[in-house]
Amino acid sequence: MGDYNMNEFAYGNLYDDDDGDVGGSSKEGNNSIQKVSMLPLVFLIFYEVSGGPFGAEGSVNAAGPLLALLGFVIFPFIWCIPEALITAEMSTMFPINGGFVVWVSSALGTFWGFQVGWMKWLCGVIDNALYPVLFLDYLKSAVPALATGLPRVASILILTLLLTYLNYRGLTIVGWTAVFMGVFSMLPFAVMSLVSIPQLEPSRWLVMDLGNVNWNLYLNTLLWNLNYWDSVSTLAGEVANPKKTLPKALCYGVIFVALSNFLPLLSGTGAIPLDRELWTDGYLAEVAKAIGGGWLQLWVQAAAATSNMGMFLAEMSSDSFQLLGMAELGILPEIFAQRSRYGTPLLGILFSASGVLLLSGLSFQEIIAAENLLYCGGMILEFIAFVRLRKKHPAASRPYKIPVGTVGSILICVPPIVLICLVIVLSTIKVALVSFVMVVIGFLMKPCLNHMDGKKWVKFSVCSDLAEFQKENLDCEESLLR
């Protein structure tokens, strides 16, 4: 679009210096913006993916203790590890903002790059619409006025604006805020796991009733608590030494996320008598009370509220930098590439915040189901792009590479694709129709943007750093972006 011909964009060595910074990750005047280091990045990944066991209660409600625990053991191998490995390889191959949009555009063209960007951005905004609502749900028992009416609406608005302002102030601030929030949110579950040991009855973990399993709720709960590993790729250009930092951070993130979901469920289902109907969102606070008393319940409630804020911050960062990356690549209008004096994508933040406010009235379960379906559609495009780039450009530089060949790269994608098919088959008609409409809107938006570009109604251009990189590498044998 505009000045940007992706057929001419040549891939070479994207690292400009020893720190692995990318030309195009920062515009002139923002080069002094501090990059995100390892520890904040791990906690950003943690909050982009899960944020802890809050919401995992539905797995026990849907399938009982045994299948819930097995799900959080097996699911990481089927979904988390393959997605994290692919994200690590692709993010070091293309360490620039935009992440998966760049991968798909490279392999399948900008039309499909825009579609994956649209679906994933919409998923992020839908996801973020949940967090202010859930935050208030955890507090309404202490402050009943927050349950309904004007006080609730005003609280959602104020909370959204405050968290949006934190995103505006810079990714480093968001990262370190995520660290402190993550430590505070997970400490009560570490305490609960220790306190529960004398009360554990292992036989409670083995309860299973295959004839009474809500598979749709079960799979959607697992997927919602363990997906979004690719989100960190959208801000790869903001990471210090991404070719080393990103793979390690993703590895630590997988371990952290898996344990943060499994251990609380292990202690909760093993320490108290089972009543599946009670295992709904927020029930872990009651479990904490039964195990440790009222003080632990209050701590878990405070941790849940804090975790929702952390997930909001991390998700908005990912969504806004995705829009910035798409603009720097010439897929969105140039105005989306503008940064604030703190190096943050101003318009991307405003668009994401507006979407959150518009969607905050939807029901929890419908949001999860619709979001998961859209997310699965985007993941299929990412898996296809990963395999295609492996096949068509095997010699391209990959600072981190999964140690498998073309056949191995296909096999890595098989388990998550099977899971995606299950989610699609089990989805309700209502959710499928809503998701289909959203996809159709994306299909219509791209030609409209092309028309606007042709009429010069809005300006599209590649970031100056990327344009310079393009010019210097036109003769490179490995031309990827098309």
Swiss-Prot record:
GO cellular component: plasma membrane
UniProt record, GO biological process: polyamine transport
Primary location group: membrane
Entry's transmembrane regions: 36-56, 66-86, 94-114, 143-163, 171-191, 254-274, 294-314, 344-364, 367-387, 406-426, 429-449
Compartments where located: Cell membrane
Keywords attached to this entry: Cell membrane, Membrane, Symport, Transmembrane, Transmembrane helix, Transport
Any Pfam family hit: AA_permease_2
GO molecular function term, any single one: symporter activity
Membrane topology (UniProt): Multi-pass membrane protein
InterPro entries the record matches: AA/rel_permease1, RMV1-like
Function field: Probable cell membrane polyamine/proton symporter involved in the polyamine uptake in cells.
Family per similarity comment: Belongs to the amino acid-polyamine-organocation (APC) superfamily. Polyamine:cation symporter (PHS) (TC 2.A.3.12) family.
Protein name (database record): Probable polyamine transporter At1g31820
